[in-house]
């Protein structure tokens, strides 16, 4: 666990982009009961936090994919972070819709990419990875070479890990669920007795709490 990972996890807790509540779980749209709720869009409203995130993502991308030529953001949550990262790296930026428009030119990708252009796709949050992997596939259909995905946070769900492995897609994240639990405990957002319950959710979210 790096200092940056723990600092960003703490920041997400402090600005209430992330809530942990193992005793009164949230219900996701999928029906899964979860002790965590994450809305990283809130980071846009905190200049110091969003700057730290953008600089962290830019540094990871530059280190892992020095050959990157274009930054893509997923619509809508990945767009602002992609714009800030592209600005730091001095690179072109595009964004990828979840599906093609049903009017005009029917674009799924907004902005310009060229055949073989090396791309990193930015997402704010990774659960199963389904939507961002579909975005990466859409970019490749348009001619891009997707080097990998970069995100602020991952729940570290087994299904997500398996999906990225299945697509042979590299995933970079600034922080993760395990680090968040450690940071929350240190900052007294949770108690020691909550830790096991929180850790159990990550292993089997579909059956947790049943």
UniProtKB/Swiss-Prot annotation:
Any GO BP: 'de novo' UMP biosynthetic process
Entries under InterPro entries matching the protein: OPRT (IPR023031), Or_phspho_trans_dom (IPR004467), PRibTrfase_dom (IPR000836), PRTase-like (IPR029057)
Binding, orotate: 127
Binding site for 5-phospho-alpha-D-ribose 1-diphosphate: 97, 101, 103, 123-131
Gene3D superfamilies assigned: 3.40.50.2020
Enzyme class (EC, first level): transferase
Keyword tags: Glycosyltransferase, Magnesium, Pyrimidine biosynthesis, Transferase
One protein family per Pfam: Pribosyltran
Keyword Metal-binding found: no
Pathway annotation from the record: Pyrimidine metabolism; UMP biosynthesis via de novo pathway; UMP from orotate: step 1/2
Single Gene Ontology MF annotation: orotate phosphoribosyltransferase activity
Catalysed reactions listed for this entry: orotidine 5'-phosphate + diphosphate = orotate + 5-phospho-alpha-D-ribose 1-diphosphate
UniProt KW DNA damage keyword: no
Cofactor: Mg(2+)
EC number: 2.4.2.10
Protein family membership: Belongs to the purine/pyrimidine phosphoribosyltransferase family. PyrE subfamily.
Function summary: Catalyzes the transfer of a ribosyl phosphate group from 5-phosphoribose 1-diphosphate to orotate, leading to the formation of orotidine monophosphate (OMP).
HAMAP family: PyrE
Subunit structure, as described in the record: Homodimer.
Name assigned to this protein: Orotate phosphoribosyltransferase
Lineage: Bacteria, Bacillati, Bacillota, Bacilli, Lactobacillales
Gene: pyrE
């Amino acid at each position: 666990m790096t200092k940056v990972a723990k600092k960003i996890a703490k920041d997400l807790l402090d600005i209430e982009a992330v809530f942990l509540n193992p005793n009164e779980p949230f219900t996701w749209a999928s029906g899964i009961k979860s002790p965590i709720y994450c809305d990283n869009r809130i980071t846009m409203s905190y200049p110091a936090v969003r700057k730290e995130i953008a600089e962290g993502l830019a540094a990871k991308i530059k280190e892992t994919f020095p050959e990157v030529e274009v930054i893509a953001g997923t619509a809508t949550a990945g767009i602002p972070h992609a714009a800030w990262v592209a600005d730091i790296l001095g690179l072109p930026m595009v964004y990828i819709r979840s599906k093609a428009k049903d009017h005009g030119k029917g674009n799924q990708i907004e902005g310009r990419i060229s055949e073989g252009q090396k791309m990193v796709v930015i997402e704010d949050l990774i659960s199963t990875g389904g939507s961002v992997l579909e975005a990466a596939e859409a970019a490749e259909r348009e001619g891009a070479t997707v080097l990998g995905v970069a995100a602020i946070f991952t729940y570290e769900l087994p299904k997500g890990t398996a999906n990225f492995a299945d697509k042979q897609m590299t995933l970079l994240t600034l922080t993760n669920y395990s680090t968040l639990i450690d940071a929350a405990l240190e900052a007294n957002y949770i108690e020691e007795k909550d830790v096991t319950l929180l850790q159990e959710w990550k292993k089997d979210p579909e059956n947790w709490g049943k």
